Amino acid sequence: MSQSDTIAAIATARGRAALAVVRTSGPAAIEIVDRCFRGDALTDADSHTAHVGVLTDEAGTDIDQVVATVFRAPNSATGEHVVEVSCHGGDLAPKMALQSLLDHGARMAEPGEFTERAFLNGKMDLAQAEAVADLIDATSTKAHQASLTHLKGRYSDLLGDLREELLNLCSLVELEIDFSDEDVEFADRERLEDLLDETEEILGDLLDTYPTGEKLKDGVQVVIGGRPNAGKSTLLNALVGHDRAIVSETPGTTRDEIEAEAEIEGVLFRFVDTAGLRDTADEIEAEGVRRATESIEEADVLFYLYDLTVGLDSQEIAFLQDLADDGSDVQPVVIGNKADRAPDLPVATLDGLTSLKLSALEAREDADEVQPLLDHLTDTVAEHLSRAEASPVVMNQRHRQHLRDALDAVQQAREALDAGVSGDMLTLDLRAALQELGAITGEITNEDVLDQIFSRFCIGK
């Protein structure tokens, strides 16, 4: 990517709308727009000023009445000269406006190129740039809030403080090396141990937030499982508030997984209605059962339905008890369904598992019927929500890996200190940890990493 040229792209979504914005950034941005703008001379305009005029094409034909907003470098989003042309929405006017800018000397922007230029010009670090993509992709209120926290720099500040601590450690050790022939002590062993222990604890705490960040970003997967005709599809429809799955009295109606989403307490929950679990000679249904089993193993929460009038068989009890006993991450909830047909029958209780009964059929008309399930889901994410509100959380797998590697390096430094290894070897580990943290914020990076990160973005961002 060259920063010597000027780029342009439509920055707003396609489709019918009151307004659209065509953005241009680069050394010639103001001159290029001025060539096709009939109104105030934009080349004479002050920064952060808006100008009403008419945009024309290469032949001088009017395209649209527009507002051109000028931002002069370095006081712009990208750190370069930027002009944002606001035209009428729809498909045609923005396309014609963009084409005019391209005809007058701009180049079509690559995906994420505006944000990449902001990063390269020091307007944001790499973690903040990635937060822009996360903010755009956010599918729930809490994911949006967590991404905004990163964009505002709280996460980067935390990493910056950690790097400062490691630099302090490195400085102390290197001073000891430089003055090893003299009777000068810059930091005693206990002080170095304390600093390493503190750094290790902070890194460990940060890594512990990743499951929270992952759930906020990707959502919580709730699998609805059980025997055929237990009422799984009816429950799915009740949980999401509309008919998403076909409901039939015929066992085996659901042969493939059906997914639906709902936001509860600001968190995205992904509900998966699975094929009924049973032995079958039907190849298509058998494939559905296989997929259902896989989904249960990957679930965050399992709502296991059974018909109260039929009860749980020994195979189901063993399956659920195994999930409870083997320390699985899956949290099963045993649900006795069709309580409207058997109001006096108790729900099955299994050691270590939550059990309740309801009527999924009645729940479609009465939201209170599924409220205990919604409360349970809220409880499962309560700790995550509390953690996200208290401090920034790690939401990015790339960051997680760099933090793991930084933690490994700090732990190796601690072991080296305990073993009495020379200061030279100790600083190698500390410098390795510094590099890993620098890779998160972009202080240390390479072109391939940048290409991979910014390719996630849409054109115009």
Swiss-Prot record:
EC number: 3.6.-.-
List of residues binding (6S)-5-formyl-5,6,7,8-tetrahydrofolate: 23, 84, 123, 461
Subcellular location field: Cytoplasm
Cofactor binding comment, as recorded: Binds 1 potassium ion per subunit.
Binding site for GTP: 229-234, 248-254, 273-276, 337-340
GO molecular function: GTP binding; GTPase activity; metal ion binding
Limits of the TrmE-type G domain: 219-382
Gene Ontology annotations of biological process type: tRNA methylation; tRNA wobble uridine modification
CDD domains tied to this protein: trmE, TrmE_N
Highest taxon listed in the record's lineage: Bacteria
Residues that bind Mg(2+): 233, 254
Pfam families, sorted: MMR_HSR1, MnmE_helical, TrmE_N
GO cellular component, one term: cytosol
Entry keyword annotation includes GTP-binding: yes
Record-linked InterPro entries: G_TrmE (IPR031168), GTP-bd (IPR006073), GTP-bd_TrmE_N (IPR018948), GTPase_MnmE (IPR004520), MnmE_dom2 (IPR027368), MnmE_helical (IPR025867), P-loop_NTPase (IPR027417), Small_GTP-bd (IPR005225)
Sorted UniProt keywords: Cytoplasm, GTP-binding, Hydrolase, Magnesium, Metal-binding, Nucleotide-binding, Potassium, tRNA processing
Keyword Ligase: no
Cofactors (names): K(+)
NCBIfam families: mnmE_trmE_thdF (TIGR00450), PRK05291.1-3 (NF003661), small_GTP (TIGR00231)
Function: Exhibits a very high intrinsic GTPase hydrolysis rate. Involved in the addition of a carboxymethylaminomethyl (cmnm) group at the wobble position (U34) of certain tRNAs, forming tRNA-cmnm(5)s(2)U34.
Assembly, per entry: Homodimer. Heterotetramer of two MnmE and two MnmG subunits.
HAMAP family, sorted: GTPase_MnmE
PANTHER family: TRNA MODIFICATION GTPASE GTPBP3 (PTHR42714), TRNA MODIFICATION GTPASE GTPBP3, MITOCHONDRIAL (PTHR42714:SF2)
Family note: Belongs to the TRAFAC class TrmE-Era-EngA-EngB-Septin-like GTPase superfamily. TrmE GTPase family.
Name of the protein in its database record: tRNA modification GTPase MnmE
Source organism: Salinibacter ruber (strain DSM 13855 / M31)
Gene transcribed to yield this protein: mnmE
